[in-house]
Regions:
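Conserved HGGG/HGGXW glycine-rich cap/lid loop of the alpha/beta-hydrolase fold
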Residues: 9-62
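Conserved acidic catalytic loop of the alpha/beta-hydrolase fold
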Residues: 70-88
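Gly/Ala-rich beta-loop-alpha elbow adjacent to hydrolase catalytic centers
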Residues: 92, 96, 100
């Protein structure tokens, strides 16, 4: 397992394949780089593919303190430069989706295009904001039940594969409490419309069922966005229906990047 160190934090990643543009896969809140395995395998046939464990996640270091989206962006920009990847296609899920958006806004010289796979809300509806805030408070108080219930009930369809739900829960619930709480605070503090207003690189949004960001609002915030919508999958659509996701990313790459 290769690593790089940025600002004292060791970051684990996998690298495979050859070809430009390179892909960087960015997982979501309390997940790890394995969640994009179906996409990494598919695109490594013709492209260099790098899958990263964000700080606080997977096999990367898990420092105390805040976890703003900007910290992930700085880490990824450092990784792109260090590995000499050129201009990449940044593919992010959930928290990783808004990280890809901010990366495209801050570093257009390093980004050929972004793919946001059911990204975290660019604007949080008040009721959802309050509910997630209560989950953060519960985590900090040592109560993990609301966190588990949120993952199992809100992020999957009733028809989702039970083995996949179990696997996702196992990884996400293993995340240390300080990371889970502070990373979610970073998500809630993110100014999505501001990032969207500054992001001028080609962008693809892949909505799930139900979408965290309705496509018509994504078009309003990010006029250059291409909207797609997976069928028969909840929030983890890149794992539930990988062929659909791979096909749409491939079409985006051919026609827009």
């Amino acid at each position: 397992m290769p690593t790089i160190t940025h600002n004292g934090v060791k970051l684990a990643y996998d690298s495979r394949g050859k070809g430009r543009p390179a892909f960087v896969f960015i997982h979501g809140w309390t997940c790890d780089r394995s969640f994009f395995a179906p996409q990494a395998k598919h695109f490594a046939r013709r492209h260099r593919v790098v899958s990263l464990d964000l700080r606080g996640h997977g096999q990367s270091d898990k420092p105390q303190g805040p976890y703003p989206i900007s910290a992930y962006v700085d880490d990824i920009a450092f990784l792109i430069s260090t590995l000499r990847l050129g201009k990449v296609v940044a593919v992010g899920h959930s928290m990783g989706g808004i990280t890809a958006l901010q990366l495209g806004a801050d570093h257009p010289d390093k980004v050929a295009g972004i793919v946001m796979v059911d990204p975290a809300p660019l604007i949080w509806p008040p009721e959802l904001n309050a509910g997630v805030g209560a989950i953060v408070a519960a985590i900090e108080a040592g109560d993990q039940k609301p966190r588990r219930q949120f993952i199992a009930d809100a992020l999957f369809m009733k028809t989702s594969d039970k083995a996949l739900v179990k696997r996702v829960l196992k990884v996400m619930m293993a995340s240390p409490s300080h990371v889970a709480a502070n990373a979610m605070k970073g998500i809630l503090a993110f100014d999505g419309p501001a990032a969207a207003a500054r992001c001028k690189v080609p962008a693809l949004h892949l909505a799930a069922t139900p979408p965290l960001n309705p496509p018509h609002l994504m078009t309003q915030w990010l006029p250059n966005v291409v909207n797609g919508w997976t069928v028969g999958a909840g929030h983890f659509n890149m794992m539930e229906v990988p062929d659909q996701v791979n096909s749409m990313i491939g079409a985006f790459l051919r026609h827009y990047v």
